[in-house]
């Protein structure tokens, strides 16, 4: 009888790792649906694997699935769904786009932190095993990540923002890697390389003073004056998943903790046609 009990204990102990699940928080306050679809696909996949997912976003589920909890930010800002014409994006000036992103990042973060549902969530001080953020136009919510002292990774729903490379020590040579905000082709002319390099250097300054400093002051307001610089917190990002692929975006150097996952949000096609039977 003792042998049977010992055998059962050994089997249960050896298989316990199969039932381990993590509590994962996804902080996704950006209001554009086109950005959210990547995060949603990843979190739904993790929930399907048995992990306990909490999603903070403007897009709560219409058809809830198991292991996936929504904390809705609906009402904190106007959603950017069918609001921005594609021709405006295609013909817009780079500096106009950068200024718009800086403004939206600041306002979005401030409105999120002032939203009652977010205040209640922060006050609860719930603990997680992993936090997922978006690397886009503000690092303001890294103040919350730092206070939680939790490992975190980031998602980039587009090609990497120019200011994202430094935190990973990733090479970003402007002599042959085009800036995200400039519409240069893969093979840049000498003039385009010069413009690309000047814009690359100028954007470092713009990001520090127009994006980073205001976001840092805002983060200190909510997470304490002793908060270290957001740029230092950002360097602890363990992994970045980028929604690009070398077959479409051209090969470029990436350090090991930057991984291209282009098409992550795509689902297998549904077979809507009846099977064709041979006579």
What is each of the regions a protein language model found here?
Residues 42, 107-188, 246-248:
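Conserved nucleotide-sugar donor-interacting segment of glycosyltransferase catalytic cores
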């Amino acid at each position: 009888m003792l042998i049977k009990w010992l055998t059962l204990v050994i089997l249960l102990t050896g298989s316990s790792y199969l039932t381990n699940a993590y509590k994962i928080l996804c902080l996704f306050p950006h209001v554009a649906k086109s950005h959210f679809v990547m995060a949603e696909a990843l979190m739904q996949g993790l929930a399907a694997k048995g992990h306990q997912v909490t999603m903070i976003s403007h897009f709560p589920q219409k058809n809830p699935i198991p292991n996936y909890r929504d904390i809705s930010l609906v009402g904190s800002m106007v959603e950017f769904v069918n609001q921005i014409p594609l021709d405006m994006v295609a013909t817009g000036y780079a500096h106009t786009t950068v200024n718009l992103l800086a403004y939206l990042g600041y306002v979005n973060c401030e409105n999120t932190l002032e939203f009652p549902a977010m205040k209640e969530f922060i006050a609860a001080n719930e603990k997680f095993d992993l936090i997922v953020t978006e690397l886009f136009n503000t690092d303001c919510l890294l103040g919350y990540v730092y206070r939680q002292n939790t490992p975190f990774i980031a998602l980039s729903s587009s090609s990497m923002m120019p200011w994202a490379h430094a935190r990973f020590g990733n090479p970003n040579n402007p002599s042959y890697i085009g800036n995200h905000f400039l519409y240069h082709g893969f093979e840049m002319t000498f003039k385009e390389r010069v413009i690309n390099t000047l814009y690359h250097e100028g954007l470092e300054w713009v990001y520090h003073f127009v994006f980073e400093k205001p976001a840092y002051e805002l983060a200190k307001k909510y997470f304490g004056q002793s908060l270290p610089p957001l740029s230092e917190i950002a360097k602890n990002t363990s992994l970045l998943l980028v929604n690009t692929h070398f077959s479409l975006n051209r090969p470029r150097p990436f350090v090991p903790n930057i991984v291209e996952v282009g098409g992550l949000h795509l689902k297998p096609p549904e077979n809507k046609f009846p099977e064709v039977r041979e006579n």
